[in-house]
């Protein structure tokens, strides 16, 4: 969860700010200012959103989906602190005339044509909401997915612009409401993109996604039907629905499962999970943390009942704010474990809003069991790679600077504090390495306890980019707390890639087993896997082979070669670096570079053996582990990465 994500302004935060401003200045302002304040209050909380996948990889889908959503007021559901003020906010219905979609090639010098893209039936609007000339009355909420034929989009661009064909398209989605200025959102999509790099038996997915079942004034996802379409377009094969414990209930959980059964097929698998807001066991005021709960691999539809046969399938609680307490972390983990499920600590070292008493995970109090000899029951790892952010923008409606008059300074700019690699490395340094070391130290000479790594987009819809309210660092840049800002994170940019040699399972059973056992790697493009081909059949993953998440023991003179396999593409660039890291009870030795064989920079073309003897000098007593990192760089200079989960090994000296 990236707290207080929102896609339109003004928001609930603006309500408070505007009321304070009004109380302070009303007596001194001229009539026109009072009228302006009145109009602001009348429109506060009205929500407009347009979204579309940032990339289209599915050649079998002839459409570009554009999601449009309008909410006339504040949601009155959920158990967040914000929802408590919702019953006091009412407004007149909105009058929707329709929606226009305009398209152009990228570049600020090219402007949108005056004529919108018209679908079958003609008229003056891409979508006409009127009936017999009368606008559509929207009392509370309205959603629509416009399916734009990609062939028609290409024809439209050829008609209006020279220099095609265009694989990257800028879009303006214009919502027309009576009495309102046009509500324009600017998007960018890449069409006809190639498939993602693949390796046999490995499936990309998002372990942390919020659907429309996350629905409050600060954070909203998209319906499952269009989420499936967007997931396939971006190259994902499975998605865990990690909607918030502050909003889920047994009825919504059951409804989600009903939808999942209708949508799951061989192309995409949904798994019903939950992001739980919990209270850390450490002392202090800022103690709210999050975890992603995943169901039992043997019964993915069971949920997290406190006892067999119970109808309480979800773990419900507050958001952690004053007067709205969250569930204790240990109680949540105990219930997850009792139901046969497991959990990852979600963004454990990223800040959560102080409004929600947000804190970070504590190694001793939260990760470790009371005796320190393992992780807390139910916990298998952490998710420090969260949100694929490299740049941010103050302009949340046009972060790409698509309009000619956009301020470049307000468009996407590098942001070192938000950079996902910076946050990932911090999470590895603060959490993963110390916990891995602890596992080796506490369990010697027994096999160490495992600590696994995962990644998730934490997208709330966010098919194109993420528009959010900054409720964490709002004092340093107040405009982002009031007006919002954008990040380039998007659904499909990050993936946990799991090994499922027998397929994903109709309900995701094999995906869950791989996540529980660490048979997974983390990637935002290239793939690198490593293991030991013990049956010497030239493949990794046969019965008896050692894969990521596995354990093995050998005499020092009998260590088999470590087999590597990788795949990248022109989009992500050739492998620039393969780094092998060996960990012991004394910590991790410095990363050692493994040369990439000439001619195999894009694809390993089978297994590549690595003699480990020169790398394993540190492993002369007790258990240790091996993990790898790969980095690529494309022609545009963009860097992409892949991280493997460890293989735990014990080397004995005769």
Where are the regions a protein language model picked out?
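Boundary at the C-terminal end of the N-terminal hydrophobic targeting segment
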Residues: 26-28
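A metal-dependent hydrolase metal-coordination microenvironment
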Residues: 197-366, 376-377, 383-392, 425-430, ...
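C-terminal functional module detector
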Residues: 30-199, 435-654
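Domain-core and long-helix interface of multi-subunit machines
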Residues: 250, 318-487, 570-590, 618, ...
């Amino acid at each position: 969860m990236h707290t207080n994500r929102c896609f339109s302004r003004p928001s609930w935060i603006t309500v408070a700010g505007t009321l304070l401003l009004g109380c302070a200045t009303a007596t001194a302002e001229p009539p026109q200012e009072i009228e302006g304040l009145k109009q602001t209050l009348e429109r506060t909380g009205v929500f407009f959103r347009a979204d579309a996948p940032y990339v289209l990889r599915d050649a079998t889908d002839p459409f570009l989906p554009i999601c449009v959503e309008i909410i006339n007021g504040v949601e009155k559901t959920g158990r967040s602190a914000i929802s408590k003020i919702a019953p006091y906010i009412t407004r007149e219905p909105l009058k929707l005339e329709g929606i226009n979609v305009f398209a152009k090639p990228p570049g600020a010098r090219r402007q949108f044509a005056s004529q919108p893209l018209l679908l079958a039936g003609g008229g003056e609007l891409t979508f006409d909401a009127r009936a017999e000339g009368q606008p559509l009355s929207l009392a509370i909420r309205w959603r629509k997915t416009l399916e734009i034929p990609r062939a028609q989009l290409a024809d439209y661009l050829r008609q209006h612009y020279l220099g095609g064909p265009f694989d990257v398209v800028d879009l303006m989605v214009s919502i027309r409401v009576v009495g309102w200025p046009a509500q324009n959102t600017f998007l960018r999509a890449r069409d006809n993109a190639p498939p993602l790099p693949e390796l046999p038996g490995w499936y990309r997915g998002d372990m942390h996604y919020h659907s429309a079942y996350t629905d409050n004034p600060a954070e909203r996802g998209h319906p499952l039907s269009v989420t499936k379409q967007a997931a396939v377009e971006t190259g994902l094969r499975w998605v865990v629905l990690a909607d918030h414990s502050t909003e889920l209930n047994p009825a919504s959980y059951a409804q989600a499962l009903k939808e999942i059964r209708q949508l799951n097929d061989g192309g995409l698998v949904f798994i019903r999970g939950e992001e739980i807001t919990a209270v850390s066991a450490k002392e202090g005021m800022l103690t709210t943390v999050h975890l992603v709960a995943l169901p039992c691999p043997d019964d993915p539809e069971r949920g997290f009942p406190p006892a067999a046969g119970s109808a309480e399938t979800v773990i419900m609680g507050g958001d952690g704010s004053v007067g709205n307490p969250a569930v204790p972390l240990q109680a949540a983990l105990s219930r997850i474990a009792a139901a046969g499920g497991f959990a990852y600590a979600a963004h454990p070292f990223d800040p959560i809003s102080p409004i929600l008493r947000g804190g970070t995970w504590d190694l001793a109090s939260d990760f470790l069991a009371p005796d320190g000899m393992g992780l807390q029951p139910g916990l298998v790892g952490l998710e420090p790679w969260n949100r694929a952010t490299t740049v941010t923008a103050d302009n949340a409606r046009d972060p790409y600077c698509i309009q000619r008059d956009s301020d470049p300074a307000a468009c996407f700019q590098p942001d070192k504090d938000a950079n996902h690699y910076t946050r990932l490395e911090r999470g590895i340094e603060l959490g993963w390495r110390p916990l891995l070391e602890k596992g080796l130290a506490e369990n010697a000479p027994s096999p160490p306890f495992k600590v696994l790594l995962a990644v998730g987009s934490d997208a709330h819809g966010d098919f194109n980019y993420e528009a959010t309210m900054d409720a964490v660092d709002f004092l340093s840049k107040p405009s982002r707390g009031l007006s919002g800002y954008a990040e380039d994170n998007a659904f499909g940019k990050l993936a946990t890639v799991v090994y499922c040699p027998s397929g994903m399972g109709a309900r995701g059973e094999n995906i869950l087993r791989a996540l529980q056992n660490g048979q997974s790697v983390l990637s935002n493009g290239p793939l690198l896997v490593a293991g030991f081909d013990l049956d010497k059949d030239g493949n990794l993953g046969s019965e008896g082979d050692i894969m990521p998440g596995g354990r093995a023991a050998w005499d020092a003179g009998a260590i088999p070669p470590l087999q590597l396999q990788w795949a990248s593409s022109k989009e992500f660039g050739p492998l620039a670096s393969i780094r092998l890291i060996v960990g012991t009870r004394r910590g991790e030795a410095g990363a050692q570079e493994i040369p990439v064989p000439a001619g195999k920079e894009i694809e390993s073309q089978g297994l590549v053996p690595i003699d480990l003897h020169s790398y394993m000098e540190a492993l002369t007593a007790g258990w240790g582990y091996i993990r790898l990192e790969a980095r690529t760089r494309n022609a545009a200079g963009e860097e992409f990465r892949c991280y493997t989960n460890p293989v735990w090994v014990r080397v004995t000296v005769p």
